[in-house]
Regions:
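Active-site environment of non-heme Fe oxygenases that use a 2-His-1-carboxylate facial triad
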Residues: 2-40, 54, 94-189
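Amphipathic coiled-coil/heptad-repeat helices and related helical stalk/stem segments
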Residues: 42-45
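Short, flexible, solvent-exposed loop/turn segments with mixed acidic/basic and small polar residues
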Residues: 47-53
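TRNA-binding/sensing appendages of the translation machinery
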Residues: 53-60
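Structural motif
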Residues: 62-65
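Short, conserved charged micro-motifs
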Residues: 67-74
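A surface-exposed partner-binding patch
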Residues: 70, 86-101
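A short alpha->loop->secondary-structure connector
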Residues: 77-86
Length: 189
C-alpha cells in the first residue's frame, strides 16, 4: 500500500480521505479522556489517549489534579511515547515553556504567546532540520486565562485534505523540504 501523501497515487488518497473524513470527531467529547493520576496512567486511560491520537491526531485530557508542577506534561508525554523534549531558548530551566503573560525581564515578552495579545495561529518546529522535527507535543493547561484564552486545534491531516482538494500544486509546494523554514530568532536582535 502506498501513502495517501504520495501525490502520484490518487486512488489510495481517495480511499484514505474517505476513511479520514468519515471518522473525524463529531464534537469535543470525542476527543476527551478523563485521567485520574497524570503521573501514573491506568492502562485504559493510556489506551484511550493513544486511540484519540491515532484517530484524530490529538486528544484532550481532563484531570482533577490541579498541581502546576511542570513535571506533569513531561510525565504524560513519556507515558505516551514522547521522550525527546525540545527545550527552546525561551523555555525554563526544566525545558518546559510556560505559556503565560511574561514580564519584560523574563525575555519572552516580545513573543505573542507570552503576552495578553490575541494570536491567530501558531505552529512549532519549523525552525528545525528534519532530525529535530517536532512530531508531538503536550499542551498542559494549569489555569484558565484571566480573559480570552480560546484555543482552536486542528488535525493536520484534515488541513492536508482541504488544501489538496483545493489545489494539488499548493500541496506540492508545501511539501518542498524548505517550504516551512525561516530563520529562527536566536536572541534580542
Amino acid at each position: 500500500m502506498t501513502s495517501p501523501f504520495f501525490l502520484g497515487d490518487s486512488t489510495e488518497y481517495v480511499r484514505w480521505r474517505g476513511r479520514k473524513l468519515g471518522g473525524k470527531p463529531r464534537g469535543i467529547n470525542d476527543l476527551l479522556v478523563e485521567v485520574g493520576d497524570p503521573f501514573s496512567l491506568r492502562p485504559l486511560e493510556r489506551s484511550a489517549l493513544l486511540d484519540r491520537c491515532r484517530r484524530f491526531n490529538m486528544v484532550i485530557y481532563r484531570s482533577s489534579a490541579v498541581d502546576p508542577d511542570t513535571s506533569i506534561p513531561r510525565a504524560m508525554g513519556a507515558q505516551l511515547g514522547l521522550h525527546r523534549l525540545d527545550a527552546n531558548w525561551l523555555a525554563d530551566e526544566d525545558g518546559i515553556s510556560p505559556i503565560a503573560v511574561a514580564t519584560p525581564s523574563e525575555g519572552r515578552a516580545d513573543f505573542i504567546p507570552y503576552t495578553s495579545r490575541a494570536i491567530n495561529w501558531h505552529t512549532d518546529g519549523y525552525y528545525h532540520p528534519e532530525s529535530r522535527c517536532i512530531r508531538g507535543m503536550v499542551l498542559h493547561c494549569v489555569r484558565a486565562a484571566a480573559e480570552g484564552g480560546d484555543t482552536a486545534l486542528m488535525d493536520h491531516e484534515l488541513a492536508y485534505i482541504a488544501v489538496r482538494d483545493s489545489s494539488i500544486d499548493w500541496i506540492r509546494a508545501l511539501m518542498a523540504p524548505d517550504a516551512m523554514t525561516i530563520p529562527a530568532r536566536m536572541g534580542a536582535d
